[in-house]
Amino acid sequence: MTVLTREKKPYFGLTGGWLTFWVTVACATDMSLFGYDQGVFSGVVITRDFLEVHDLVGPEKTKTLSTVTAIYDVGCFFGAIVAFTIGEQLGRKKAILLGTTIMAIGAVLQAASFSLAQMFVGRIILGIGNGINTATAPIWQTETSQLKWRGKLVIFEMMMNIFGFCLVNWINYGLSFVGGSIAWRFPLAFQFFFLIILWSTTPWLPESPRWLIAHGRQEEATVVLSCLEAKPIDDPFVIAQRNEIEFSVRYERENSMRWRDLCQKKGNDSKTLRRLLLGAGSQFMQQFGGINIMSYYLPTVLMDSVGLSDTMARLLAACNALSYLVFSGLAVLLVERIGRRGLMLLSTFGQFLCFLIITILLRFSRISDNGEKFASASVAFFFLYYGAFGIGMLGVPWLYPTEINSLPMRTKGAAVATATDWITNFVVVEITPIGIKNIDWKFWIVWTVTNAAFLPILYFLYPETANRSLEDMDEYYRSNPALVVTKDPDAICRRRPQKYLQREEEEIERAAAAVDKRALSVGAVEHAEWTNAMGNKS
């Protein structure tokens, strides 16, 4: 058992904002690597040397090429399942270290590949590691962040995801002038830059206090909470936080549901299944909003659908990544002001509008004498699509499952959401080259319709999680809320509802009273001992 002392200074003496900063460095590095991996193959698959080495030259190889690209997402899906099955036992830190080590093996296999089979295996292994990490990092960040910073920091992670995506697009563009094997081997090997940072930071950072309490390690959790808040371990606020987490853990254990119960739709009063589906649904909508048509294939799309040259397609993809980074940065500023619901609605509407206009322009480019001008005009809306996606549907679907699910279900819920993301990602990446080749401009109608369909789902079914503690969401679902959230003003308002503020104040007052009572008791005992000692001397 850990012995707590005031003199003990874990985490190199870092507390408060600085400790949160270093947790964010680790989580943001993980998400930067995720973004890097999303973009790296867009340049690899149009590199002549890569295609020749792996016997992928020619239109008859389109199906194989789409599969070797998409198989990474299958690996990510199974990685999320691994996180779902053993992540709760390992803890947040160990799960990330496991995922990082697996990714290193996959990166070596890819960068050193001389056969299609080796590339397949490397991409699957890399995906497994990434699936573990992407299912875990947002939870770790969420559970170690103060309420006022939680949303901003997770969205910042996704901004760093786009930094990785932006970086690799410029690397791909620069290496296109070099040619040869280095044009694709170097970008694949550069993943070790991120992996080394993860190995260097994660081991010494704090474990999630919520995970520690859920596994009976209350003393360690109290130390972590006091360090994260930069307060003494007996501070009323720290004690109140610990008590709230303990209550949520006890409540969920008393009312917990097995997976069999979820599938049989047996009810319980914390709405576990509904919360699980809302979190997974946000990831489903992210992928079928069409983003990974662009992330994996933008140069291909610009060459095949718009008619641009290889060099111009790579350059525009790199420039687009910069604007994408700017819009993802705006989300950090807006996520608490507009809320999770507002950003998802705004983002999805923007995506719908962009795909609608892209569809119309590409249709006219096929039937008009000025077809080239219509095709060129569509490029602007590919850029704007990234902007619309970046301000909302980029980050919120990664944040939402970590907030909406209860503590005992948080790892499982985030893993199910991540698995949903990756299996739908695989579908999108697999069908894109085939769809563009076979149905041309009509392919874009599909994504126009899906985005339009998501708008009423988001508006009527998704409650707001901004400016709520994780325990607030547990209390909300214990109140047996209606399925349609627009009926309850507290469910959709951006500010923290008054009833949760009042409950927190009462808990702090009780904790302070308990501390005072304990201090008085200790003082009385010390006084009695001193009196007895003086009496004995007499």
Swiss-Prot record:
Keywords from the UniProt entry: Glycoprotein, Membrane, Transmembrane, Transmembrane helix, Transport
Compartments, record wording: Membrane
Main location: membrane
Membrane topology: Multi-pass membrane protein
Top-level taxon: Eukaryota
UniProt-listed SUPFAM superfamilies: MFS general substrate transporter (SSF103473)
Gene Ontology CC terms: membrane
UniProt name for this protein: MFS-type transporter oryC
Organism annotation: Aspergillus oryzae (strain ATCC 42149 / RIB 40)
Gene: oryC
